[in-house]
A protein has these predicted regions:
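Structured soluble/peripheral alpha/beta segments that form catalytic or ligand/cofactor-binding pockets
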Residues: 1-216
Length: 216
């Protein structure tokens, strides 16, 4: 059992994803043609003392939005405070924007300026993120070449791996999907959060013309 001090610990509860068709890819419907094999994805749950931020965006290779979700939400001190339905204080957002700064020679962001606009009154909200460290999502099965999600390995299979974070190949496909622990600022507020990113294939707004890497 691990005890967390609510005065020093912040967190975000993700929803249940249920059963996901990840092993072997989603075989439903016709496959996408190679020209559309690209994805730009950002997800940023951020925690401040008095509020939380939810920012999610999918865009195509030209930077056109495919899906976006955004909100400013109240922060809760205890589980007992969580509402059964949506809190009426939740403010929904639209018109997501982003400006990322990347590590040399890779697509991994070290800083990000994100913004969106409130649906209720049109006010624009901007927040700045600075990377503290990077977590490689292949460590929990995302795009791992051998131990991907849902891959059947028999009745009992066990393995372990170690990676030297100083020499990880940032050009490799399995290392593109990351979550960065970020120091976040929103006006006078300073908080903590995560920026999850995945950018594969061409992406015109940042000049990416290959499958991975800065220029492919």
């Amino acid at each position: 059992r691990i005890e967390f001090d609510p005065d020093t610990t912040r967190g975000t509860k993700d929803r249940s994803w249920g059963i996901r068709p990840l092993a072997g890819g989603d075989q439903r419907g016709a496959p996408l043609p190679p020209a559309r094999s690209s994805l730009f994805f950002l997800w940023a749950p951020l925690n401040f003392n008095d509020l939380c931020v939810h920012y999610q965006l999918f865009e195509d290779s030209l930077g056109r939005p495919l899906s976006s979700v955004g909100a400013l939400l109240p922060a809760y001190d205890t589980l007992a405070e969580l509402p059964d339905i949506e809190d009426p204080r939740a403010r929904h957002m639209r018109a997501h924007e982003h400006r990322l700064q990347f590590d040399a020679g890779s697509r991994l962001a070290h800083t990000a300026d994100l913004s969106f606009t409130a649906v209720d009154d049109g006010s624009r909200h901007e927040f700045h993120l600075e990377r503290i460290f990077t977590f490689r999502m292949k460590g929990i099965g995302y795009h791992h070449p051998e131990w991907g999600h849902g891959a059947w390995k028999g009745d009992l299979a066990m393995a372990s791996e170690k990676w030297d974070m100083e020499t990880v190949d940032d050009q490799a496909f399995e290392n593109q999907h990351c979550q960065h622990l970020m120091r976040a600022t929103l006006g006078d507020r300073v908080g903590i959060g995560v920026l999850e990113q995945l950018c594969i294939g061409p992406y015109k707004p940042y000049g990416f013309d290959g499958f991975v890497g800065r220029s492919g």
